């Protein structure tokens, strides 16, 4: 739908109010109608599903053949006969790792090796147009693919019946933990060339992805991948962040969940993650396109573990506010505050009673609201900043429950409702005034537990 057609739906009531004012001079009635629109809250909206899609190694940014190795890379090779393998070899000839092609699948097929930092390598097979997990390949002892030196010293090559290895940045086989990229310190949407941007967790590859779309076209495309540098010689695959362009500081900033520290022994947090669970990250150059690296450090949160941060500067309170999930009595939303963007942060509120995920602060009609998903089959809306419960978002088709969902592996269902509510208000001229981006929690069939392979994208609109 073209932008000038938007008045057919999104601006109809506002247009009628303006025409009434112009033709009749009845300011009272017109003003009342416009005031009613301004008084609406997120709970008054009825979201309609507009678009859904799960990318399965089909949203790629190819890298040239002379690129050697990326710790967030997707490596694919066509297998025509067995035995076959993908080898990781140093320029001096030292074989660091061999990823053998599955022998329980009859060639020809395409094998995919998806790296996720210091973790297992996901080995996937695409045959007859369907991609499935074949197995998880452990990394050899002493091999950490995040080492910066490997980006110039390692070569990926096919051996036996495997052809040339193609390297790409990828949206993976699932997309989750979605959050809009914002501009300034007060959480307004960031735009480039009529497109809005969002970050997401790349499933299988285990990295922070960036994608964009035109709200009038819903043409979602992969833009890039962000890695994080702690200054320890590694390029890390952290995920679940809030990225914003702080124009006042002259840099890009992010609040990031430090999942890459699991098993590193950097702290005593959940599953080995560094204490507090969150980092601050920053860079001068625009990190939205291609492969980017942001410097990062711990946010310094003490004691409890946290994730899913959403941060703003509140000019009235003269405080940075951080809305996040805290690991206490389960996982519950909480508001913290600080004088500085990179901490230290202290609690402003107690935790909410509901299970929480995807904590997000956003605007509607000049009022900030707090949103989060939940295991309780709801997308909750709370007040900002003191977290008083207001209600729930209404969706015509929920990405959980009894509604069958089409996937590359057939029609499936999931009862897991812990999805992220990525809410935003659009400017005039679009088919819908309000937009909601979220995901489902459908895992790839046959994936050993525990796993995080879920993530199909959904876009909703409301007026």
What are these regions, as identified by a protein language model?
Residues 1-11:
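N-terminal secretory signal peptides that target proteins for export/translocation
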Residues 16-23:
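Bacterial N-terminal signal peptides
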Residues 31-463:
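Carbohydrate-active catalytic/glycan-binding domains of CAZyme proteins
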